[in-house]
């Protein structure tokens, strides 16, 4: 069934690339208060590099902010005449309106910008089917930062699988958290899925806006209230309006991510996601909170922060992601084998983005394998047998498949899986996994 996915709250209509400070030529740039709140005014943006890929309603190619914009690729035909089809133009302008002297500047004005119109018709709007097509197309050319300023409360497994494929191919996914904070904050998808950077909205006082959906899956916050952006001229005669929503916080984070990735091109998508969280400007309660995640994205801090440890096996949250022929044809290679039955490896977990890791192992014939995760008490490891299909199996299947920390290989040896998961209320963990083979 087609589902409308657009996230927007209408407020009003209005008639290291160097350490140098940014200079904006556009007349309304001084009124774009959000630029200073994310540090975009304190450093000069780089030229085009890792692209920002906007999947949304159409972006108006005739608008003065985009008609002659360099480094802009329209990945399909754009339509902007439906009731909600101003949204993509606004989102794209927040991220990457050029410094062309017209009126406004995006967070990353020189960005390589890609736009995909995921609206099917003015009536049905953006649907899971069209988003899957968009992500599939963009994934062919990772790395990119994919911005999804939409969502819904009904998860689509097909969309999740495609997003996991994009992440595996080297793209970073950024999504709006949702605008249902005043309605109990129901879980929103795709924002709440692992490996998606979920973004909530803050105001000029760095306070979470009441409409911004909150939850333990939130990663970051960014300005999203009273934003000035471009719209098709049918929406407003002067081509601009003032809007609010997490839809407009997400492209700020997407632009920041593309900026940092362009300056620090050796980062993986997982490292970039971790870097943005670690360098965020903490607001609200100290540390992580459900309203602002790890804090407001901070571009200068992300440019300067140490490189996080790499987590090269992602995504590996479940058996289906590592077993060949299930989600991915090649799956993941076993971390142990008959010739090397013992191993130590280091990786990370994070509650909202990467809550568990699963590895394929080989248990040698007539030997036992033991597993442990050393992390200061924040993570634990356990073994699943060869017939397990997932780490969330029902109780009956668990009794058959869950082996604890020790497993015997039998007369011929056996495939198995090791799950490492966060314990208690831990938000993150840096762990060392030990897989040790022995006769007893």
Pin down the residues of each PLM region.
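C-terminal subdomain of the subtilisin-like protease fold in secreted/lumenal serine endopeptidases
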Residues: 21-24, 39, 65, 134, ...
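Bacterial N-terminal signal peptides
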Residues: 7-14
């Amino acid at each position: 069934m087609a589902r409308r996915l657009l996230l927007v709250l209408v407020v009003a209509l209005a008639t290291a690339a160097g350490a140098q400070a940014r200079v904006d030529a556009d007349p309304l740039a001084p009124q774009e208060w959000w630029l200073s709140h994310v540090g975009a005014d304190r450093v000069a943006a780089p030229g085009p590099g890792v692209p920002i890929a906007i999947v949304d309603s159409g972006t108006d190619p005739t608008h003065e902010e985009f008609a002659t914009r360099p480094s802009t690729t329209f990945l399909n035909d754009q339509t902007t005449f439906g009731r909600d089809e101003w949204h993509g133009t606004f989102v794209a302008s927040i991220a990457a309106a050029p410094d062309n002297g017209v009126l406004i500047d995006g967070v990353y004005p020189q960005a390589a910008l890609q736009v995909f119109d995921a609206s099917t018709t003015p009536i049905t709007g953006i649907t899971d089917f069209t988003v899957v097509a968009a992500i599939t197309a963009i994934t062919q050319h990772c790395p990119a930062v994919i911005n999804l300023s939409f969502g819904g409360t009904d998860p689509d497994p097909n969309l999740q699988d495609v997003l996991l494929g994009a992440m595996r191919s080297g793209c970073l996914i950024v999504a709006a958290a949702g605008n249902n904070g005043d309605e109990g904050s129901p879980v929103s998808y795709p924002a709440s899925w692992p490996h998606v950077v979920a973004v909530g909205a803050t105001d000029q006082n760095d306070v979470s806006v009441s409409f911004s959906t909150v939850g333990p899956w939130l990663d970051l916050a960014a300005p999203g209230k009273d934003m000035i952006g471009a719209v098709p001229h049918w929406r407003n005669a002067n081509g601009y309006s003032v809007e609010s929503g997490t839809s407009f916080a997400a492209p700020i984070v997407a632009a920041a991510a593309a900026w940092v990735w362009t300056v620090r091109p050796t980062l993986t998508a997982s490292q970039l996601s971790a870097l943005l969280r670690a360098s965020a400007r903490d607001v609200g309660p100290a540390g992580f909170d459900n309203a602002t995640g790890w804090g407001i994205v901070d571009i200068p801090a992300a440019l300067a922060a140490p490189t996080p440890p790499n987590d090269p096996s992602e995504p590996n949250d479940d058996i289906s992601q590592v077993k060949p022929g299930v989600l991915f044809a090649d799956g993941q290679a076993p971390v142990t084998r008959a010739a090397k039955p013992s191993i130590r490896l280091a990786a990370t977990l994070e509650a909202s983005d990467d809550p568990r890791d699963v590895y394929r192992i080989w248990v040698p014939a007539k030997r036992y394998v033991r597993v442990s995760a050393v992390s200061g008490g924040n993570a634990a490891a356990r073994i699943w047998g060869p017939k397990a299909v997932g780490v969330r199996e029902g109780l009956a299947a668990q009794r058959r498949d869950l082996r604890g920390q020790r497993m015997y290989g039998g007369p011929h040896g056996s495939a198995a899986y090791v799950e490492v998961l966060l314990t208690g209320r831990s938000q993150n963990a840096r762990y060392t996994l030990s897989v040790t083979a022995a006769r007893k």
